[in-house]
Structure formats: structure tokens, C-alpha cells
Amino acid sequence: MPIRHPVGYASRMKSKYVDGFLVVVAKKKLADYVTLAKKAGRVWMAHGALGFYECVGDDHPAGCGIPFPKRAKCKRTETVLFSFVTFKSKAHRDAVNAAVMADKRM
């Protein structure tokens, strides 16, 4: 699936653990979501995440499993993003996420 990366931060370290999410966003609110995601990405990276990505699908071809928009039950006025954060390990993820949730910027 071709993707656009409105937000993407990465370090050079290899990741071994990933948190991934499908996020449904109203198309007319996508710019607002990207602004919020950029702020969130900076917070995750400041607390040690190895990478932070927000990917918007441009093309969801049939015959490639269940396309994300169908799986996420998107309306025609919505789009779906595949968002993921990378970490060294599950323990590293747990520590980073705890710090992020305690961060006043969130």
C-alpha cells in the first residue's frame, strides 16, 4: 500500500518491539491530527522511543487482504492511518509509555 508520512521521527537504533494502531480520522480534520501527532511524536522521542510514525494510506488495493479502511469501518468522509512507535524491547516500551503518560505536555 503506498503511504504518505505526515509525521515520522526515527533514530538509528534497531527496534525490536512495535506498538501499532489503526486510527480513523475525518478527512477534513487530517491537518489538525497531523499537528497533534507531531507534538506527540516529539514527546515519545524525548522519552526514548526509537521511532514514531503516522502513515496515511493513498491506495488500498483489493486482493491484498482486508484493506485498512474496510477493517476500520471508515466512512467516505474519513481516512485511516497506520500509526506505530518503535522500541528496544517490551520493557523499554513500558518505561517510555509510562514517562509519556506522566508528561504534562500530553
Model-identified regions with their sequence ranges:
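Short S/T/G/P-rich N-terminal loop/turn motif that feeds into the first structured element of a domain
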Residues: 2-106
